[in-house]
């Protein structure tokens, strides 16, 4: 089966919720890792630092700063060896965190429903898997860029974006030159 972004999007939008509800485990595990980092001293402590009073004056107290805090916090905890599980994507814990927490934080802070969260997380994670399989074994494209692309798709959809806007999010996040078409000039077909 040739996987396309359209197939990923359609799957995330139309699959019965009970069949994909398991994706909430990624949110629970990765958020718990972030929260653990806020309580301890892990790695560079960036997630914890971004929550401080001084940093709020620099970064602000916004959805964006919260996304940065949770995502970097969970990565700090993971990389510093905290005894806490995280959910990976394509074999990488940091990619799993980066495909999950931006979408989760955005959904929570904007009052999105559980169904919307499930579908956005599924879109994010499957987009990462789709892009990774399109890139092949070796790529000059960093895995965290790929994970951020997945998150951008999930957040775009949560903002009311259509399939076309989700596809534009991919193109804006990943240079078009990194992915090649199977039979057309666009990998998004």
Describe these PLM feature segments.
Residues 62-81, 114-131, 175:
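Acidic-glycine-rich active-site phosphate/pyrophosphate-binding loop
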Residues 86-100, 144-146:
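Conserved phosphate/anionic-ligand binding catalytic regions in large, soluble enzymes, centered on
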Residues 96-112, 152-160:
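Alpha-helical support elements that line or immediately flank enzyme active sites
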Residues 113-126, 130, 134-147, 162-168:
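Phosphate/pyrophosphate-binding betaalpha-module
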Residues 166-176:
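Flexible glycine/proline-rich, aromatic-decorated loop/lid segments
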Residues 177-185:
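Conserved small/polar residues in nucleotide/adenosyl-binding loops
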């Amino acid at each position: 089966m040739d996987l396309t972004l359209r197939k990923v999007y359609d799957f995330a939008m139309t699959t019965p919720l009970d069949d994909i509800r398991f994706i909430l485990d990624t949110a629970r595990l990765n958020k718990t890792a972030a929260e653990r980092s806020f309580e301890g001293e892990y790695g560079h402590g960036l997630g914890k630092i971004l929550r401080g009073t001084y940093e709020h004056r620099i970064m602000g107290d916004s959805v964006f700063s919260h996304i940065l805090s949770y995502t970097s916090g969970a990565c700090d905890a993971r990389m510093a060896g905290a005894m806490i599980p995280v959910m990976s994507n394509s074999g990488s814990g940091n990619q799993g965190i980066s495909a999950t927490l931006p979408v989760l934080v955005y959904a929570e802070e904007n009052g999105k429903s559980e169904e919307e969260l499930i579908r956005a997380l599924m879109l994010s994670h499957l987009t990462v898997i789709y892009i990774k399989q399109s890139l092949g074994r070796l790529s000059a494209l960093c895995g965290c860029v790929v994970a951020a692309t997945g998150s951008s798709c999930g957040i775009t959809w949560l903002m009311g974006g259509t399939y076309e806007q989700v596809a534009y999010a991919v193109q804006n996040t990943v240079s078009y030159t990194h992915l090649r078409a199977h039979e057309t000039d666009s990998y998004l077909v």
